[in-house]
């Protein structure tokens, strides 16, 4: 089988990055790591989808500002999101002048964007390449499960999609951190069709990529301080460890998952956006979630579910 891993002779450098989050993300263990926090889930717009575009717009702008970069310095921007036709990205970055490559890789979009940006810069095809992505709890629920106004119950295996966006720029030269190598994953479908159990659906593919990296490089899990996955969460992380156990690959001692790290499951309750209806009724997933007639700056808040 052809190797899927490329080790760069001259590792490209991540020269700048920025992260934008929502209220719930700010209240988590890594809340202080965000460059900007937005308490309004609409981000001063009138729909959640437009709000998600603001996440990307803000992340790109802040990443440029932190490194004193101008738009003309960027040779290519690689971006995507979880929505149909990547509208969160295209509307979010359409005001920028740099060349754009749209990608769709669901939950691995940022990893793929960083992979492609690194290959473009390491190969001499770009001087500075940016990658950007975003997600929004409310847009993801409508896209993959049910609109919030449906009022459906969330099963124990359901994951909470982060309301956040991130951007970074990669250069052939610079200081650490470096991208020393990349592994292109393969499609692994074990037949999981439950949209409320994404951890089980993604764990086999995550394990396949991790295993392939170690097979290609001859390295072992113990060679790393941490092996970090994106959003397997509790169910997927347990399955990942079990898959490793079956093949003698110990992933239990140093595996971390961002989906588990970004929230404090002991202290944070699941919180839902609400708005005050004319009759004073408060609505959320358990009620009539009316946002279509909302105007920027009107009554919004957080509903404890």
What are these regions (language model features)?
Residues 90-142, 146-158:
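A generic, well-ordered mixed alpha/beta core segment in the N-terminal half of proteins
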């Amino acid at each position: 089988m052809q190797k899927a891993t490329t080790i760069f002779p001259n590792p490209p450098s991540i020269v700048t990055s920025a992260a934008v989050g929502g209220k719930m993300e700010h209240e988590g263990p890594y809340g202080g790591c965000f460059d900007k926090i937005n308490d309004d889930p609409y981000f001063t717009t009138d729909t959640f989808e437009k709000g998600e575009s603001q996440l990307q717009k803000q992340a790109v702008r802040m990443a440029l500002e932190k490194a004193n970069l101008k738009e003309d310095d960027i040779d290519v921007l690689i971006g995507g999101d979880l929505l149909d036709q990547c509208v969160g990205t295209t509307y979010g970055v359409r005001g920028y002048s740099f060349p754009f490559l749209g990608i769709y890789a669901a939950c691995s979009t940022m990893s793929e964007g960083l992979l492609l940006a690194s290959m473009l810069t390491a190969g001499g095809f770009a001087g500075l390449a940016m990658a950007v992505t975003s997600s929004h709890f409310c847009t993801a629920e409508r896209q993959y499960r049910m609109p919030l106004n449906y009022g459906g119950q969330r099963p124990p295996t359901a994951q909470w999609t982060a309301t956040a966006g991130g951007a970074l720029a990669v250069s052939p030269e610079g200081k650490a951190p470096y991208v020393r190598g990349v592994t292109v994953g393969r499609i692994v479908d074990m037949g999981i069709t439950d949209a409320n159990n994404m951890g089980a659906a993604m764990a086999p593919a995550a394990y396949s990529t991790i295993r392939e990296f170690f097979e290609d490089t001859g390295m072992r899990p113990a060679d790393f301080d941490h092996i970090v996955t994106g959003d397997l969460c509790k169910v997927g992380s347990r399955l990942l460890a079990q898959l490793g156990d079956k093949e003698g690959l110990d992933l239990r001692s140093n595996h971390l998952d961002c989906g588990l790290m970004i929230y404090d499951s002991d202290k944070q309750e699941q919180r839902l956006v609400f708005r005050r209806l004319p009759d004073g009724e408060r609505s959320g997933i358990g009620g009539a979630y009316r946002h279509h007639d909302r105007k920027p700056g009107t009554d919004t808040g957080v509903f404890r579910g």
